[in-house]
Every structure is written in structure tokens, then in C-alpha cells.
Amino acid sequence: PIDRKGTKCLKYDFAVERGMPADILPLWVADMDFQTSSYIQDAIVETASHGIFGYSESDDAYFEALQGWMRRRHQFEIEKKWVVKTPGIVLALAMAVKAYTKCGDGVLLQSPVYYPFSEVIRDNGRRVISNDLVLGEDNRYHIDFVDFEDKIVRENIKLFLLCNPHNPVGRVW
């Protein structure tokens, strides 16, 4: 890990003014405390060095990398036309909620979960239906599949939002 204090880092340098204790240990998911890979740093420098910052598009190499990863990791073939890029997870969640449900529909999630999941559902006029994760004797969270199936049938669920890896419980499903 690297010391991010004094780098205008939101989770450390602005904790007190956001009402947090000065000695808080922030355990954020998407704000890492380790240095970015040199390959990524080099690619950023190379891209920035031409000095033009207009809109860009992904080329075939981008899609081929995604396809290769899905093939190696999940033995699953994806098509380029299936890939929809978004600037962030919250917008992607909102797009899915709007595309696959109607106002008043129930959308299933698994609590506890990253709070924007439920906000996006409510903000779009849908109902939050929770299949609560269960903390087992092994001190790991598990899915209650009986409740999961019951909620899908009883609430006529049209969409299930899976958080994977799960935030905040840390499970990879």
C-alpha cells in the first residue's frame, strides 16, 4: 500500500470536513491504496502525450480482449454487439432498470448491498425487493436460494441486480 494522505484523496484528505473522524479507516472498494500498474501508467502517458483530448472510440482490440477474457474465465462466447459501455456502474444499473422493468415492478437485490443499487430502483419508480444474504457459521455470507426463488415467484420479479464481487460483504459469486 501507498500513503495517499496529502494527495487530495477524497477518502483521507476530506474525511473530517465530510463529518468523519480524523482517524477513520476508510475501506472503500473502488478507491485503491496501491499504485497503478506501470502498463496502465505508460498507456495513459502515451495517450496524453499527443495532446488531443476529444472523443474516442474502442477499436476491435478492446472487444477482442473482452471476448478472450470471457472465453478463458467463463468458457462463454460473447458477441461485440452485446457490449454496452457506460461511464459507471450507477448509470449501468439505471439503464438496466429502465430497459427491463416498468414502473411499479419489483427489482430483486441482495442486502446488504452498495446503496446506489436500491436508490436507482426507487428513483425509477420500481420496488426494492431484497433477498437478504445470510451470515453463515463459517462467517461468510451465503445466498438463501429458497427465499430467492420465493421472492422471484411471489413478487413477479423481472430483474435481479447481482453485485459481484459483492460490496460490502466481499464475496465473489
Q: Over which residues does each language-model region extend?
A:
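Conserved core of the PLP fold type I
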Residues: 53-173
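N-terminal small-domain helix-loop-helix segment of the aminotransferase-like
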Residues: 2-88, 95
